[in-house]
Design a protein with these regions (language model features):
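Alpha-helix N-cap/helix-initiation motif
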Residues: 67-71, 288, 322
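Right-handed parallel beta-helix
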Residues: 114-115, 152-160, 245-255, 268-280, ...
Length: 334
């Protein structure tokens, strides 16, 4: 019996020695290297993030999954703690977690357990107006519910749902609804344009729309006060990752985004694996994924049910795009 047990342990060693106790790749859905075979272009394997074993639960930072408590500080404090400790996992357990913007930092895996719903607040004031890029142009928008900038080795994984509360933000065109749906929406509040064909959630949202000649980017808005007046029009993308490397989105669901859902910009080594994106059929600018000026990306095993484009591959627009000069390259969609 002792000899047989020893033989079993020795046989198992080759399988466990490839992953250090202190750090390990976290993908639960292994990527078959055959995906790189017979490509019409040369492409390196997309690098996957690896994280230390350290982990924290947001509940220990005071977060409450009751759907009423605003957990912005608790979630971001947990992320900062893991980042400062050298990396690991931030666990969002079962519950409904109301929050404002979440900023992901390097070496952090934001992991959602089953029956975890991360619901972003519909309070526009919770989202600061920041310089960004939208529709390929430099502009200002509200900070995204989920964001990262100049980060490396980051992930959002697990089984949970991220709900952008987009109905609070989006205008709705009459032609996209039935008569009863339209009447119900109008009675709920908000304002209509002069032709009564588009519903806006606030007067500020309508004012922002009127300031746009094209591409949803306002013109002639100069002071901070003027920008604040149209805050409701500055709908953020649900997830904005900028200039980040080794990015993984896996297993989770993103839904009901205020504008585009997922927008990696100038990122490298991106894996989108086994996720769902769900936006209503009437969602204005409700793209699922806009991959912009990115290099080395896998978009695999995922479902995109969007109110607009499912997948867009782009590299900026007009003078702004030419000045950036970053093509989108080495992308596999399967």
């Amino acid at each position: 019996m002792t000899r047989r047990l020893l033989w079993m342990v020795v046989c198992c060693l080759p399988f466990i020695s490839g992953c250090k106790q202190s750090e390990c790749a976290i993908s639960e859905n292994a990527i078959d290297d055959t995906i790189y075979q017979n490509l019409p272009f040369d492409m390196p394997k997309v690098q996957q993030p690896v994280f230390p074993a350290y982990e924290v639960n947001i509940s220990k930072f005071g977060a409450k999954g009751d759907g009423m408590t605003l957990n912005t500080k608790a979630i971001n404090d947990a992320i900062k703690e893991v980042n400062q400790r050298g990396g690991g996992k931030v666990i969002i357990p079962e519950g409904t977690w109301l929050t404002g913007p979440i900023e992901l930092l390097s070496n952090v895996n934001l992991y959602t357990e089953r029956n975890a719903l991360v619901l972003f607040t519909g309070d526009f004031e919770a989202y600061p107006i920041i310089p960004t890029s939208f529709e390929g142009l430099d502009t200002r928008r509200c900070q995204s519910p989920i964001s990262a900038r100049d980060a490396e080795n980051i992930a959002i994984t697990g089984y949970g749902i991220f709900d952008g509360n987009g109905d609070c933000w989006r205008p709705v065109k009459k032609e996209k609804l039935t008569a009863s749906q339209w009447n119900k929406l109008v009675k709920s509040g908000g304002v209509l344009d002069a032709q009564e064909r588009i519903w806006y959630p606030t007067a500020g949202s309508l004012k922002g729309a009127m300031a746009c000649k094209d591409f949803n980017v306002p013109e002639g808005i100069n002071t901070d006060e003027e920008w604040n007046e149209i805050r409701a029009w500055l709908r953020p993308v649900l997830l904005s990752f900028v200039k980040s490397k080794k990015v993984l989105l896996e297993g989770v669901t993103f839904k009901n985004s205020p504008s585009w859902c997922l927008h990696p910009l100038s990122c490298e080594d991106i894996t989108v694996n086994n996720i769902q994106v769900i936006n209503p059929w009437y969602s204005q600018n409700g793209d699922a994924l806009d991959l912009e000026s990115c290099k080395n990306a896998l978009i695999i095993n995922s479902v995109f049910d969007a109110g607009d484009d499912a997948i867009c591959i782009k590299s900026g627009k007009d003078e702004n795009g030419r000045r950036r000069g970053e093509p989108c390259q080495n992308v596999i969609v399967k």
